[in-house]
Every structure is written in C-alpha cells, then in structure tokens.
Amino acid sequence: MGKEKTHINIVVIGHVDSGKSTTTGHLIYKCGGIDKRTIEKFEKEAQEMGKGSFKYAWVLDKLKAERERGITIDIALWKFETSKYYVTIIDAPGHRDFIKNMITGTSQADCAVLIVAAGTGEFEAGISKNGQTREHALLAFTLGVKQLIVGVNKMDSTEPPYSEPRFEEIKKEVSSYIKKIGYNPAAVAFVPISGWHGDNMLEPSTKMPWFKGWQVERKEGKADGKSLIEALDAILPPARPTDKPLRLPLQDVYKIGGIGTVPVGRVETGVLKPGTIVVFAPANITTEVKSVEMHHEALQEAVPGDNVGFNVKNVSVKELRRGYVAGDSKNNPPKGAADFTAQVIVLNHPGQISNGYTPVLDCHTAHIACKFAEIKEKVDRRTGKSTEVNPKSIKSGDAAIVNLVPSKPLCVESFQEFPPLGRFAVRDMRQTVAVGVIKAVNFKEAGGGKVTKAAEKATKGKK
C-alpha cells in the first residue's frame, strides 16, 4: 500500500443556472464514491420521471434532498478522486444556508471552482450586477479561499457550438472581475467544458481542437493541463496547522454511561492527545483529557481536520456547551472575548446598519448575539483602505471596520492567527446579512475558573 492521498476540500460556486450541479454530479459520477447500484437506481428513476437528460444533476439533487432532510448520508457520495487527491465538495450553493456554511463551515475550502455558463445571454445574466457569481467569488476571497479554477461550462450551447471566440471573451471578462476582487488571473486555470457531454472534464475534448490547454503561474511554480480534473490536480496542497496552539470548537457534549462526559468537535489547529490538560473557554474550566477517539477507535493524537470525541474527568455535561473552545492550558490557551474588531461586508440588508445593531453572529460552532458597538470606518472592499471615518450607517455592498461586543461570553480569535475562529456570518431575518473577518480581539482576563482535581493531580504529577 502506498501512502494515502492528500485530502483537499473544494467549494463549487457560480450562478444558479451555470450547470454547477451537472458538472459536480459528473465528477462524482465518474470518479467518485457512488457505487454502480446507486447510479443505476438513480438513472432508472430519472428515466421514469422523464428526467433522462438530467442524470448528473439528478444524482446531485437526490444527494442534496437527503442532505437537507438532515439524513446523514454517506459523505463518501460528496467525494471523488483525482490522481493526486481525495477531493471533498464541502458545499454547493443553491443550498439555503450556503453562505453560512461556507463561513462557519466544518472546513475551510482549499480551492473554489467557479462555473460560468457560456450560452448566449447566460453568462451575462450570471455576471450582471445582481448576479450571484460576483457575490460568491467575493465571499470565497474574503474568507481566505485563495485558489480559484474557472470552468467555462455549456460550451456545447454557444453560437456556433464550441466557439473559441466566446470562450476567449468570457475568459477576458471573468479575469477582469476576479482581479477586482483580489485574485491573480495568471494563477487561475480557465477550462472550457461541457459538464453534460463531458468535454474537457476528464480528458481533452475532440470538439475543441483550438484549446491548447490551460496554464497557471504562481510563486510555487507553473502548471498546465487540458482538463478540469488536471486543474484540480494542480491545486497547491494545504498546510495543516499542527504547529499552532490547540483550538477545538465543541459541536456537542455527550454523557456516555460508564465513560462520563464526552465533548465532540473538530480539531482546527494544533494537536490533542490523551493526558493534555485542556481549558474550555470562555467558561475557563480546566481538566485532563483521559482518552481521544475517532470513529470508535482510540487515537494517540488528533490533528487538524479530525472530528473527535474526548473523555474529560470531573466535568459535568451541564458545564460545557456547543460553541465553547478547548485549548491546551500550557500553550496559549483560548480566552473569552470582551470585544473584537472586524472587517464586515454587508451582503443583503434591506435597510441601514448603524451603531447599536445587535444581530446573531455564527462563528465556528458558536451562535451568539453581538452588538455593533462602533462602526469605525468604511473601507474599500478590495484594498481595505479607509474611505470614510465614523460613518452614520452602512448598507448592502459596503465594507466597514466595526467594533463588536458579545452579549454573552464568546470565544473568538483573529483570522490571521486562527482562521476558522476568525470568520463569522451575521444572521438576521433568517438570512445571512453580512460576513466578517476578525482583525483583533480584546480578551477578558481569565478569572478564577474551575480547575478539576484531575487537572491538579496531573499537573502535580508532572512537576
């Protein structure tokens, strides 16, 4: 057995009718975790419903419906393999909570795949001022997804079909607007594809002999290829932050008979081992980790990306809750935030936002009301340069530096140091009205929290 392939996460973005589902469905279908039986079942159903022409997207719709009904479907279905990577699609838009998921998402995307439709009029609709394409690309960039691939889809429906001038026109247009957002077009692969017919998806298409391939240039070196799957192979692998201090936001806390209290969550940075003396912020409870397990197997060490349960001594289920963050008491432990400063981008708020506005913030697994105490300045979204100091209010489309005060204890970090704990969604009226990236945190001084006997004992024993 060779070494296991590296895992990477991608997010697929683009306008509603760009063919994201068909393209994604095609990759999952051809290279993915869906077994033949399931595919045949889906095909038969699609045929019976007269949706034969829709099979790839249909596969995805079936998966989406199950995902939305909260059925924990076999996540393997959202995975596919390239020659180099195991790729997981962490979310595809169209899902109601896409924006929120992308921010609080259980994982950071390593790369965004932007699908644009090449059909006459379709591309223009997706990219128009109110099209979703811009918003998704802006979000991806703001949230730290620095790699981008562009699939120019539906090449079979250009005038004439598979038109080179149309591809070049779209490439030029998209390059100019992703550049405005902050991406470097020279580092972006542009691939003309048909997600439906499969052109340039896995191998070079005979229908576009004019396409000599895509090239990218970046400081890590050059890459080139012909197909979309090769572009995915050229993604730079992420550095998983094992060397940083431990941060593990809790998703749930269970009481398990005969074992005790078991918090569950995903290691975002650092490592967690049995014997670690952890502190839970913002409650400031310190205790010893007895054991760590993943998928019912004991682990000697959990690393970033691992979803684990760990057993803690002398702490009751009532003392811990979702949204708390575990860290190592001896290595830059997490603390509660008194207040914090963030760059906020307003996406869709019907009115004006001014000082005193108190929506709910979703940051990692925490869900807490925070007050916009002071809108310090309006800034240019791309450069971050100040355009107005102490504005009266901000509205949709604006970016601003804001000071926020949580209404209850909350543990957050700067995006610079701990990205997953430094980005948030602002929720109001059942939608995401803004997104933010935390610049600086004013921590509360940790005062007299609970230190369990287990922690004291373990600490004494180690002296």
Swiss-Prot record:
Residue segments, region G2: 70-74
Keyword Cytoplasm on entry: yes
Annotated segments matching region G3: 91-94
Keyword vocabulary terms for this entry: Cytoplasm, Elongation factor, GTP-binding, Nucleotide-binding, Phosphoprotein, Protein biosynthesis
InterPro entries: EFTu-like_2, G_TR_CS, GTP-eEF1A_C, P-loop_NTPase, T_Tr_GTP-bd_dom, TRAFAC_GTPase_members, Transl_B-barrel_sf, Transl_elong_EF1A/Init_IF2_C
Annotated ranges, domain tr-type G: 5-242
Ranges for region G5: 194-196
Protein origin, superkingdom: Eukaryota
Location of the protein in the cell: Cytoplasm
PANTHER family in alphabetical order: TRANSLATION FACTOR
NCBIfam families assigned to the protein according to its UniProt record, in alphabetical order: EF-1_alpha, PRK12317.1
Family: Belongs to the TRAFAC class translation factor GTPase superfamily. Classic translation factor GTPase family. EF-Tu/EF-1A subfamily.
Name this polypeptide is given: Elongation factor 1-alpha
